[in-house]
From Swiss-Prot:
Its EC number is 5.6.2.2. It is an enzyme of class 5 (isomerase). Residues 512-619 form the Toprim domain. Seems to play a critical role in chloroplast nucleoid partitioning by regulating DNA topology. A type II topoisomerase that negatively supercoils closed circular double-stranded DNA in an ATP-dependent manner. Made up of two chains. The A chain is responsible for DNA breakage and rejoining; the B chain catalyzes ATP hydrolysis. It catalyses: ATP-dependent breakage, passage and rejoining of double-stranded DNA. GO terms for biological process: DNA topological change. Keywords: ATP-binding, Chloroplast, DNA-binding, Isomerase, Magnesium, Metal-binding, Mitochondrion, Nucleotide-binding, Plastid, Topoisomerase, Transit peptide. It is found in: Plastid, Chloroplast; Mitochondrion. This is DNA gyrase subunit B, chloroplastic/mitochondrial.
Length: 731
């Protein structure tokens, strides 16, 4: 493992693979800029414009992996200056009426979440989900997705094809209606709906994509004819063209849409990530076992062309097997499918002996409900009740006053549940939580019936699950005692802080930030170079505990972990996270750009992810990017963040130029002023904000990389070794 220069984090998280996208963000007290993959020259110690620094260093940039997906994402935001002026008047002339698709272009974030990378990819998902709805309705079996070299995307299915007849209300073709009118679609339910079950509810998906595309082309195959029409920024620029298909093609049906995102809307990030889209496609293929989805990325360089086909006949059972590939299962994957009261339930689950947290994924009409909902609540309630009842019935749980909590029962559980609901109630356009109360009852009863019958017929499986749950209870009691001991030692609740923490004078956590640095040497430079008004420094003594392999009791006894919990104000694991309790809202990991530094970054990320995952969800975790090289030519000094920048600087010099190159092996080698100028100054530094995009895949990666299975870790490294630049080997 010591072969890779920035191995544990850079390559490990490269291995963690395309599951990781990192958000670059730097902040001043008046303006906030953020970027991803934007070009930036090396830092020169002269006055500079902040925008010149907007680029992501390859230090831990994760993208372009083949078989893995980004589980951390980046969003790009720029906060415009708001002039504080009083309105000159407020009358009827100030009341604006936005017509057609103007509301979408005026406030795109309301429809796609953001105008950064996440919103950009949301356009693809809107069209993709429409195609999947055709598959769920039983009319489509194949979807082709192509990421073209000109940064357009095309999605084609073999479903029924969007209707093209004249619509009785709009007096336009039905195709133009769904493309140009908000809340027009065939998925509103009822006898007149074109779909019994669908993920689209508001009739805005296709029209929103059209509104936010500088160009969109649609082709329909239906009733032996081919229809074509072109649009720009939500408006048709051609009429609907129709011609007959050749005799041999008259059975062809389906819809193909190709769109070019509007540069006026997506001004900061216009690059589609293959692996991010591949992850969503893989998910949809697991959820729809009769559907085949092909993904291709075109490129002018033949070696960079990527393509994969996703088909999983085993459905959710295969999904759980994939999620648990690096774990030690206690039993075979359990799975069932049932329909009750018009709701279809598809579920698979498995407990693993070497996992100490649960992974529960919920879907409603193939839409990932990242915030859970009534279907997840139903599963949790049923599991807790079933295992307590069967445990007491089998005398495995003997004490009358002991009951297993949901947390104990679910330790080591991987569960995926997908429900198909005719009239789902989602929270918001982004559909992050399912709200139908009737779903909880149906799911609860279905899980109760299936799991009770199965476990009574397989007492060995029941015994292994109960043994795991009872061990979780004992570990929780031991951890509770350890927490109390820690509290008594003034680690969690005392006002005293770790001795090595150099705190800042700011008392508002929103204004304060803390750098977690590697060792006293780097800590000394950082303490001298920082701005004491709002920057705190916490030096670590060597590598912290790998909590992936330890229980809570051992974690709380570790001094470095104690320092992190107290210094950052993380509270107690398992308790509700309160951002206002944090001492700093910006937690910056700042380590050396070598093997040890990358390993420490990975250990810290593992700790934060397992101990308080909400830190990622709240956008509190950052990685600082120090320069690798210092180039001096005369009075000019250049700082380069990777080998590519170094070569670029060298090429800019005359062939006979004389200059000196210094490679920084550690932060301790940098003078405090250098560290401030290049790495800590909010006006010139480069930070990467880490946000969990897919908790399930993040869980898989952390388990693979930091768990006890050497064979799985070795396989992960070998599978990704071919993607490593040989020049980055540290031999």
């Amino acid at each position: 493992m010591a072969l890779l220069k920035p191995f544990p984090l850079q390559h490990s998280l490269r291995c963690m693979a395309s599951r990781f996208l990192l958000h670059s963000h730097y902040h001043t007290h008046t303006l906030s800029f953020s970027s991803i993959s934007l070009s930036r020259p090396s830092i020169v110690l002269n006055p500079r414009v902040i925008n010149k620094l907007r680029r992501l260093s390859d230090a831990i940039l994760i993208r372009n992996m083949v078989s893995l997906r980004a589980f951390m994402s980046s969003s790009t935001t720029t906060e415009a200056f708001q002039e504080n002026t009083k309105s000159k008047g407020y009358g009827s002339e100030q009341i604006q009426v936005l017509e057609g698709l103007d509301p979408v272009r005026k406030r795109p974030g309301m429809y796609i979440g953001s105008t950064g990378p996440r919103g950009l990819h949301h356009l693809v998902y809107e069209i993709l989900d429409n195609a999947v709805d055709e598959a769920q309705a039983g009319f489509a079996t194949k979807i082709d997705v192509v990421l073209h070299a000109d940064n357009s995307v095309s999605i084609a299915d073999n479903g029924r094809g969007i209707p093209t007849e004249l619509h009785p209300v709009t007096k336009k073709s039905s195709l133009e209606t769904v493309l140009t009118v908000l809340h027009a679609g065939g998925k509103f339910g009822g006898s007149s709906s074109g779909y019994n079950v669908s993920g689209g509810l508001h009739g805005v998906g296709l029209s929103v994509v059209n509104a936010l595309s500088q160009a969109l082309e649609v082709t329909i195959w239906r009733d032996g004819k081919e229809y074509q029409q072109k649009y720009s920024r939500g408006k048709p620029i051609t009429t609907l063209i129709c011609h007959d298909l050749p005799v041999e093609m008259r059975d062809r049906q389906g819809t193909a849409i190709r769109f070019w995102p509007d540069k006026e809307v997506f001004t900061t990030e216009m690059q589609f990530d293959y692996n991010t889209i591949a992850g969503r496609i893989r998910e949809l293929a697991f959820l729809n076992p009769e559907l085949t989805i092909a993904l291709k990325k075109e490129d002018i360089d033949p070696e960079k062309i990527q393509c994969n086909e996703y088909f999983y006949a085993g459905g959710l059972v295969e999904y759980v097997k994939w999620l648990n590939a690096d774990k030690k299962p206690l039993h075979d994957v359990l799975g069932f499918r049932k329909e009750a009261d018009g709701i279809t339930i598809d579920m698979a689950l498995q407990w693993c002996s070497d996992a100490y947290s649960d992974t529960m994924l919920g879907y409603a009409n193939s839409i990932r409900t990242i915030d859970g909902g009534t279907h997840i609540d139903g599963v949790k309630a049923a599991l807790t009740r079933i295992l307590n009842n069967l445990g007491k019935k089998s005398k495995t749980i003997k004490e009358k006053d002991i009951s297993l909590s949901g947390e104990h029962v679910r330790e080591g559980l991987t569960c995926v549940i997908s429900v198909k609901v005719p009239n789902p109630e989602f929270e918001g356009q982004t559909k992050t939580r399912l709200g139908n109360p009737e779903v909880r009852k149906v799911v609860d009863q279905s899980v109760q019936e299936y799991l009770t019958e199965y476990l009574e017929l397989h007492p060995d499986v029941l015994d292994s699950i109960l043994s795991k749950s009872l061990n979780a209870l004992k570990a929780a009691l031991a951890a509770k005692r350890a927490r109390e001991l820690v509290r008594q030692k003034s680690v969690l609740k005392s006002s005293s802080l770790p001795g090595k923490l150099a705190d800042c004078s700011a008392t508002n956590p929103e204004e304060a930030e803390i750098f977690i640095v590697e060792g006293d040497s780097a800590g000394g430079s950082a303490k001298q170079g920082r701005d004491r008004r709002f920057q705190a420094i916490l030096p670590l003594r060597g590598k912290i505990l790998n909590i992936e392999r330890k229980d809570e009791a051992a974690m709380y006894k570790n001094e470095e972990i104690q320092n992190l919990i107290l210094g950052l104000g993380l509270g107690v694991k398992g308790e509700d996270f309160k951002k206002e309790a944090l001492r700093y809202h910006k937690i910056i990991i700042l380590t050396d750009a070598d093997v040890d530094g990358a390993h420490i970054r990975t250990l810290l990320l593992t700790f934060f992810f397992r101990y308080q995952r909400a830190l990622f969800e709240e956008g509190c975790i950052y990685v600082g990017v120090p320069p690798l090289y210092k180039v001096e030519r005369g009075k000019q000094v250049y700082y380069c963040y990777d080998d590519a920048e170094l070569k670029k600087v060298q090429r800019s010099f005359p062939s006979n130029a004389s200059y000196n190159i210094q490679r920084f092996k550690g932060l301790g080698e940098m003078m405090p002023a250098q560290l401030w100028e290049t790495t800590m100054n909010p006006e010139t530094r480069l930070l990467k904000q880490l946000v969990v995009e897919d908790a399930a895949e993040a869980n898989v990666v952390f388990s693979s990389l930091m768990g006890s299975r050497v064979d799985i870790r070795k396989q992960l490294i070998q599978n990704s070794a071919s993607m490593m630049n040989l020049e980055q080997l540290d031999i």
